[in-house]
From Swiss-Prot:
Reported function: Catalyzes the reversible formation of acyl-phosphate (acyl-PO(4)) from acyl-[acyl-carrier-protein] (acyl-ACP). This enzyme utilizes acyl-ACP as fatty acyl donor, but not acyl-CoA.
Pfam families linked: FA_synthesis
Species this protein is from: Herpetosiphon aurantiacus (strain ATCC 23779 / DSM 785 / 114-95)
Protein name: Phosphate acyltransferase
Pathway the protein takes part in: Lipid metabolism; phospholipid metabolism
One GO CC term, this protein: cytoplasm
Lineage: Bacteria, Bacillati, Chloroflexota, Chloroflexia, Herpetosiphonales
Main location: cytoplasm
Subunit architecture: Homodimer. Probably interacts with PlsY.
Subcellular location: Cytoplasm
Database matches in NCBIfam families: plsX
GO molecular function: phosphate:acyl-[acyl carrier protein] acyltransferase activity
Length: 368
């Protein structure tokens, strides 16, 4: 398998991208094509043992800056890592593209270079959003911000197929993200989309879902929103999870220190006891005071792992005629490795062909 990685993309490139590519190549034995500034990539590769690994480097002399307009940058900078990488996929020289760089440029480039699946008006990003009961698929999480109701219905159709074929949910429950469960809640986009989704016999539409229901009740397997709202929910969720784990961690540390200090006096008293009794009393006293805080560490670590975006690596861009994974801009080596793993899974599961074939059997909603 041949995966193209934007080695110059991301806040921690090329250190994180090169390290992640090496880990992926060593784990799965795939060819990882590193596209970007050749000199910096090779300098980073030289720091690692890459023997028996297939890691070709393709030079991309142009860099798309985060301040640039995505569509204009893709058109002007044909020798950027994003443009070159996507052309490799389009031309059949690679199977998938992964980037933690300019997400807007990646999405615009995928749309211009790979093109859309026949009948699809706009692409969408699908994110595995953590919930109490597991995960819900949130789409769109940032690809198309200015939407028509017909776009959201197509997002629901693609999410339905993705959930069935990739996540193995036989009858995915589709929910429309809104500020209330009632059909008349939301802005005009949400209300008009609600009417269209109710008319779809190919979808198990359960109605509007509020963000709290998505997180706690697990009422929907697929949650549909326009890219602006979906991206806000995603980033707000990241902030909330970070706040919870950070606050809990700080409280545990403070409690542990307080109990340890309170345990010093009985410990000193224990040392005055005769024989082995002093050591038993000392251990029992300190353990009793520090154990409650220590016991909270394991659940906290489990929560952090469950909420960690690095475990999924990135978000697949659905609706384009090729596999493109948009990774988090702050991706470290582990996140890059998992994004590559997500790309190879999409290749193995034939995501594009599966969605395209499945949508041929249902009536797509054309844009008005």
């Amino acid at each position: 398998m041949r995966i193209v990685l934007d080695a110059s993309g991301g806040d921690h490139a090329p250190q994180a991208t090169v390290a992640g590519a090496i880990a992926a190549a060593r784990t799965w034995g795939d060819q990882i094509i590193l596209v970007g500034d050749e000199a910096s990539i090779r300098a980073e590769l030289a720091k690692h043992d890459t023997s028996n690994l297939d890691l070709p480097v393709v030079n991309a002399p142009e860099m798309i800056e985060m301040t640039e307009h995505p569509a204009q940058a893709i058109r002007r900078k044909r020798n950027s890592s994003v443009a070159i990488g996507l052309r490799l996929v389009r031309d059949g020289e690679a199977d998938a593209f992964v980037s933690a760089g300019h997400s807007g440029a990646t999405m615009a480039g995928a749309l211009f270079i790979l093109g859309r699946i026949r009948g699809i008006e706009r692409p969408c990003l699908v994110t595995h959003f953590p919930t109490v009961h597991g995960h819900a698929l949130l789409l769109d999480s940032g690809a198309t911000t200015d939407c028509k109701p017909e776009y959201l219905v197509q997002f629901a159709q693609m999410g339905n197929v993705y959930a069935q074929k990739i996540v193995n949910i036989a009858m995915p429950r589709i929910g429309l993200l809104a500020n209330g469960e009632e059909a008349n809640k939301g802005d005009k986009l949400v209300q008009d989309t609600h009417v269209l989704l109710q008319q779809r016999s190919d979808l198990t539409f359960i109605g509007n879902v509020e963000p709290k229901d998505m997180l706690i009740n697990g009422s929907a397997d697929v949650v549909v929103a326009d890219g602006f709202v979906g991206n806000l929910v995603l980033k707000f969720g990241e902030g909330v999870f970070k706040m919870i784990t950070t606050a809990a961690s700080n409280n545990i540390k403070a409690e542990w220190r307080k109990n340890l200090v309170l345990g010093l006096l009985p410990a000193l008293v224990a040392l005055t006891l005769p024989g082995k009794g002093r050591w038993r009393a000392l251990i029992a006293g300190l353990t009793g005071l520090t154990l409650p805080a220590s016991m909270a560490v394991a659940p906290l670590l489990a929560l952090r792992k469950r909420m960690d975006y690095r475990s999924h690596g990135g978000a697949p861009l659905l609706g384009v005629n090729g596999i493109a994974i948009v990774a988090h801009g702050k991706s470290d080596a582990l996140a890059i490795q998992n994004a590559i793993g997500q790309a190879r899974n999409a290749v193995e599961q034939r995501v594009v062909a599966t969605i395209s074939h499945a949508l041929e059997t249902v009536e797509l909603v054309p844009s008005a």
